[in-house]
Structures are given as C-alpha cells and as structure tokens.
C-alpha cells in the first residue's frame, strides 16, 4: 500500500484532511509541524518526496528549499513546478518532473516509484551528489567570489593574489 505522509502546516491543511476523511482515505498520515532537526528523519522515512506548486508565472523562478532538502537526503523528488527548479532536477537526474496541477501525472509518478524502487534509489543518490557538488557552502562562496571579481573587473593576476 502507498502511504502519503504530510508533515507541517499550511493554508490548505484542514481542507485536505477533511477531503481525505470524506473520501475514506486510510493511506494518508498527517503530522503537525516539527522542529527543524526532526525533519530529516521524516524525509528519510520516505521512498519519494513531493514538491507541488500551483501553475503560476511567479513560481518559474523559485527553487523550493524543500526540493534541495529532499535531494540532500538522497530521496527522489516528484516535482510539480515549472522553470528553474525543473531545470535543476533534470540536470541532477534526481527525480521526475510533472506538469503542475496534473493529477494524472502525479498518480503515474507515485506508481512509478512504488514499482521501481531501485530507480528511485538511484535518482536519490544522483540528487544528493548534485546538491553536494552544486549547493555546498564552499561551492556557493566560490561562485559568489567569481561574480564579485567580474563585477570589479579585476585582472587575472590580481585575482590570483586575492585567492591566495
């Protein structure tokens, strides 16, 4: 049986709980907001993690922190977000991207991971490696320094002295 674990709060939480009860769904578990240090244990208890946002122009430039947290815990992501987040997930080979608000695609993606656990584990590993490589503090600091150097238009020799 596929079980959905929904952790945290949100504007739609009570409506979703009521809808699940009305439909007699027994495979949904709701957990209240948790302390930040407890979140990785919930993520690691999952076979795949969902990041779903409404289809909106605004969200095309968003990179949900949840997505990076899930990837850092080596969990494959089912992503219903367009734009930058989707590009990152594809480059990382860390999950499956679906169209936002496409319930049929969501069902298919959940079923895929339920039936293909090894593929999910591989995507999870890919995502973790990508996050470590591309989003570590060291990597971010190096990118930031390069941008500053370009903005300051420092000659190559001067850059070497600063880095030393």
Enumerate the predicted regions with their spans.
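Nucleotide-activated donor-binding/catalytic signature segment of Leloir-type glycosyltransferases, i.e.
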Residues: 5-8, 13-41
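Acidic donor-binding loop of glycosyltransferase active sites
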Residues: 25, 43-60, 75-76
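Short alpha-helical segment that forms part of, or immediately flanks, the ligand-binding pocket
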Residues: 37-40, 64-73, 83-87
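Conserved donor-binding/catalytic loop of nucleotide-activated donor transferases
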Residues: 44-47, 68-76, 91-92, 98
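Conserved acidic donor-binding loop of glycosyltransferase catalytic domains
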Residues: 52-53, 79-81, 90, 98-99
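A short, well-ordered alpha-helix in the C-terminal region of glycosyltransferases
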Residues: 105, 112, 119-133, 143-146
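C-terminal alpha-helical cap of glycosyltransferases
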Residues: 137-164
């Amino acid at each position: 049986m596929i079980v959905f674990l929904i952790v945290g709060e949100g504007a739609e939480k009570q409506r979703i709980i009521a809808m699940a009860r009305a439909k007699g769904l027994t495979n949904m578990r709701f957990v209240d907001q948790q302390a930040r240090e407890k979140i990785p244990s919930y993520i690691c208890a999952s076979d795949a993690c969902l990041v779903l946002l409404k289809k909106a122009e605004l969200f095309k430039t968003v990179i949900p922190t949840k997505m990076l947290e899930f990837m850092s815990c080596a969990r494959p992501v089912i992503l219903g977000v367009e734009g930058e987040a989707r590009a990152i997930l594809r480059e990382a080979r860390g999950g499956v991207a679906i169209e936002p608000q496409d319930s049929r695609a969501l069902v298919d993606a959940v079923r895929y991971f339920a039936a293909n656990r090894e593929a999910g584990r591989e995507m999870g590993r890919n995502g973790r490696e990508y996050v470590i490589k591309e989003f570590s503090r060291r990597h971010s600091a190096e990118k930031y320094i390069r941008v500053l150097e370009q903005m300051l238009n420092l000659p190559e020799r001067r850059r070497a002295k600063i880095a030393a």
